[in-house]
Amino acid sequence: TNTPEQDRYLQAEKYIEFYVIVDNRMYRYYNYDKPAIKIRVYEMINAVNTKFRPLKIHIALIGLEIWSNEDKFEVKPAASVTLKSFREWRQTVLLPRKRNDNAQLLTGINLNGTAVGIAYPGSLCTQRSVFVVQDYNRRMSLVASTMTHELGHNLGIHHDEASCICIPGPCIMLKKRTAPAFQFSSCSIRDYQEYLLRDRPQCILNKPLSTDIVSPAICGNYFVEEGEECDCGSPAACQSACCDAATCKFNGAGAECRAAKHDCDLPELCTGQSAECPTDSLQRNGHPCQNNQGYCYNGKCPTLTNQCIALLGPHFTVSPKGCFDLNMRGDDGSFCRMEDGTKIPCAAKDVKCGRLYCTEKNTMSCLIPPNPDGIMAEPGTKCGDGMVCSKGQCVDVQTAY
């Protein structure tokens, strides 16, 4: 089992500031059409983001470089050689110029063998946080699946065994895929969590600024981008009560975002300045509740009747006042409060703030709920008009709180 601190780290949203290089061969393959290449890359990033969302990872495209004149290092068909060259180029040239968490080379070269991608395993936030993908198919979704697969390796995820399943398939980390993959398997999620706790990559905890993101703003992708105030995903998925998922704008001030749950709770309203609903707040202590049967106390409406029902069941109610008068005796069972180990009897006005007495409906008994020390009236319980129990005394509700 994990420590609370480990669980906090696992649950935290992760952000990969992602840099993509399109090499010269891919540029030529798309007939020197930079706008078309950009759209293709933006669509891929969007697809990759969708696949990583269940892992609480957001991919933020903070740089897209198209090598329209020539490659900045020699891109070779040997995948491992190109990966090493790309790693060295990122380290010496790209990082000093533009900080990033991970970089990808998207190449038009035909990599040797059956490989269409290669990555350093478990390498995020290190000098080896790079991968190479061949743009091997016109179908964007297939290449986006390969991007997700190789970035998965960077995140410590191994290839799936035969026993690993995901619905719908095929799984993203299968070694060989012929169709676009949509989901990580349970094995992949386990690998990823083990990698996170082992290596603790820190660079993925900071959220990129909206001005750093170079891809066009898409309302519904969980990123607050230029022109958006909030982004909580699709209208069906949105969990932010004060963000309008359809427009990615804050809901107006005064819109109710959390209804009052009961008499002693207050409704919360959006501020117009935040996507989140304000903290749950309670009705003030002493506010009348349950048709004036009680007064609010710390978000509850304590009454003697409810206390009897909670302890003994729905067939019980509070005893008549005659039973409570026994609290003036100050003996073993009937008293108002303890002082230095001594049971203090109740004054006549305080009897309903001492030992609790309940009666089975349609009987006249004075029952004491079973407890060796007796059950006392709860603090804040109404003991008369405008009066509540406080420290074993029946006091004015105006001065009690």
UniProtKB/Swiss-Prot annotation:
Matching PANTHER family: ADAM A DISINTEGRIN AND METALLOPROTEASE DOMAIN, DISINTEGRIN AND METALLOPROTEINASE DOMAIN-CONTAINING PROTEIN 28
Protein residues bound to Ca(2+) 2: I218, N221, F223, E225, E228, D231
Major localization class: secreted
Record CDD domains: ZnMc_adamalysin_II_like (cd04269)
Expressing tissues: Expressed by the venom gland.
PROSITE patterns: ADAM_MEPRO (PS50215), DISINTEGRIN_2 (PS50214), ZINC_PROTEASE (PS00142)
MF terms in GO: metal ion binding; metalloendopeptidase activity; toxin activity
Domain Disintegrin per the UniProt entry, residue ranges: 216-285
Residues at which Zn(2+) binds: H149, H153, H159
Positions annotated as glycosylated: N112
SUPFAM superfamilies: Blood coagulation inhibitor (disintegrin), Metalloproteases ('zincins'), catalytic domain
Cofactor, free-text remark: Binds 1 zinc ion per subunit.
Single biological process term from Gene Ontology: proteolysis
Disulphides: C125-C203, C164-C187, C166-C171, C219-C248, C230-C243, C232-C238, C257-C277, C264-C296, C289-C301, C308-C358, C323-C366, C336-C346, C353-C389, C383-C394
Location of this chain's protein in the cell: Secreted
Cofactor: Zn(2+)
UniProt keyword terms in alphabetical order: Calcium, Disulfide bond, Glycoprotein, Hemostasis impairing toxin, Hydrolase, Metal-binding, Metalloprotease, Platelet aggregation inhibiting toxin, Protease, Secreted, Toxin, Zinc
Entry similarity comment: Belongs to the venom metalloproteinase (M12B) family. P-III subfamily. P-IIIa sub-subfamily.
Name of one Pfam family that matches: Reprolysin
UniProt-listed Enzyme Commission number(s): 3.4.24.-
First-level EC class: hydrolase
Binding positions for Ca(2+) 3 per the UniProt entry: D265, L266, E268, D280
Protein name (Swiss-Prot/TrEMBL): Hemorrhagic metalloproteinase-disintegrin-like kaouthiagin
InterPro entries in the cross-refs: ADAM_Cys-rich, Disintegrin_dom, Disintegrin_dom_sf, MetalloPept_cat_dom_sf, Peptidase_M12B, Reprolysin_adamalysin
